[in-house]
Swiss-Prot record:
UniProt-recorded name of the protein: Ribonuclease R
Single GO term (MF): RNA binding
GO CC term, one of those recorded: cytosol
Entry-linked SUPFAM superfamilies: Nucleic acid-binding proteins (SSF50249)
Substrates-to-products reaction catalysed: Exonucleolytic cleavage in the 3'- to 5'-direction to yield nucleoside 5'-phosphates
Keyword Ubl conjugation: no
Keywords linked to the UniProt accession: Cytoplasm, Exonuclease, Hydrolase, Nuclease, RNA-binding
EC supergroup of this enzyme: hydrolase
Function of the protein: 3'-5' exoribonuclease that releases 5'-nucleoside monophosphates and is involved in maturation of structured RNAs.
Entry similarity comment: Belongs to the RNR ribonuclease family. RNase R subfamily.
Organism: Helicobacter pylori (strain ATCC 700392 / 26695)
Amino acid sequence: MQGFLRSLFFGVKKIPKPFAPLVEKGVLKEALELKKDRYFLKEGFDIGKVEKVKDKAFFISLAKNYPKDPLIKNLPPSFKTDALILCQIECSKKRPIAFFKAALLNADHTMIAYLAKKNNQIVAIPFKEPFKKPVSLKHSQKSLLELPRHCVVKIDTKKREISEILGALEDPLIDENLSLSLFDRVKDFSKDCLNLAQHYAQLKASDFKDRINYSHIPFITIDPKDAKDFDDAIFYDQEKRVLFVAVADVSEFVPKHSSLDKEARVRGFSVYFPNSVYPMLPLSLSQGACSLKAFEKRLALVYEIPLDNLKNARLSQGVIEVRANCTYEEINHFLSANQSSLDKDLQQSLLGFLEMALKLKKERLKKGFNFNSFENKLYLNKEGRIEKIETEKESDAHTLIEEAMLLANQSSARLLDEHFHNKGIYRTHKEPSLEQQKRLYDKLFDYEIVRPKNMGFFPFLEHALKIAKEKSIEREVSRLIIKSQNLALYSPLQESHFGLGFASYTHFTSPIRRYSDLALHRLLKELLFYQAKGCSYLLEETPELCAELNALQKKAALIERDFIKRKFARLALELLEKEFLGVVLEVKDWVVVGLKEFIGLKVLVKTNKVFKPLEKVRVTITHADLILGQVRGEITERIKEHVS
């Protein structure tokens, strides 16, 4: 049903029989209009899911994107999280309002809950709505007592029976499965899918004809040290000033409409945890036949990009053999110490392209923005607890890969612009609205960063980061700036990418872990190598596909965030009643304090006292909630000077 409802945003020629009653006499009648022989959802109407947070209900659209999820008004209390509803949307400055119009599909009859004793009875408490009335189960109290304390279970809400046992809440090794289950991420591949993947994984590069042989070119991959799937490789020919970017040709192993394709599309993206990955494709492909492993012949789509004339980039179907799989750390060591066991031609390639990459980046940042995200990387021990936290900062090795990938992605967007009249699968990013900009100015004012009169938004961002660097508060200011931005989205129509400063952009370089890139590969291959016969068909599905991908992208981010929050809550349980030095990050209903010793751990403090962002404080951890992934505490001392 979701597929049909999503298609109404983009127009359907015919209403399928099972859904005709909804349209002819039912709840959708007033919300649809006929335009150019297609049924469309009228302007102002929207279809989406219910997401409950404490006593509030928010609306998550199936296809549209809002700066903030709309708050639902007049929702009947019987509606649970994930119910599908029709709403009328009223946009306001702060947060859009969704007025409930009709029910389309109540929530799935399954729920993740944990068992707890209430009034001497073991009951199930919903994870997503722990403040609601507990669910009494049909199982005997004796059988429930045999399960671990705070056992996490999946429940069939119609039958009020346990359908799956996930494990004990207190066990840190449950966290991956729990986060995936909470957001309905499909974990396992079907038998058909695995068999098909195994079949394709056994094919050799030599089995594929009409490909250019690039195996003499010494490509190199550069990835994080824990990477297992290698999507992309580069080589720079200094003499010809040509950059080669090779990207795994995944579409050769994933036929359109096959079980492999359908299950990849349902996932949309690979989900990454600190110690594992839940891939979009089976491991025999994602870490096997498609992965660009050193000294293995692999199928690839290869861009040859002349740096003196970027518009003359050429895309070919090739066979490559990567010379080395390297980590960012290894390449950074080589670039700083000029010592490496890499072959001389690889060393020359890296040094030559670094010089060009730094120039490209400098030029790009005249129009684009350098978002310093200060990503926190968690390292977990065998028990699933946080062992250490490292902050990863951008390096020259990152710049090498980033600039190469940006060039390949831009080259792909240029092909869409020229051949499909600005239609396809684009990656877009809207500039923050005036209201969003004003909120950021106000927050930065609290950080004693003032916007000079008549300074535009983009120059001010650079100005703010420059001051932040001088004040040694770059991390905090970067976090605020990133939070003020709109989400980058997939779009079937060309729009600019504000953050990067590009008029046109797409995703091409990660087809092992992103379905968007796989779909783009099919479109470009059809255009360049197969007489463009199937292009119109592939283009027709891009509006619906982009809407799906935007929803799946959000889901993947929520899964990863939920996991991290719970890991920090577990860490906090070991630190109860201990005092730490912290800095005030935010002041809203709660004062949010970031700990200096455990970067990324945020403590919520309820207080009547007035605090300012960047105040240095001492905070005691008093409570950690594994359900909500929250850590709470008390401020025991305020220190006058700002954090340095």
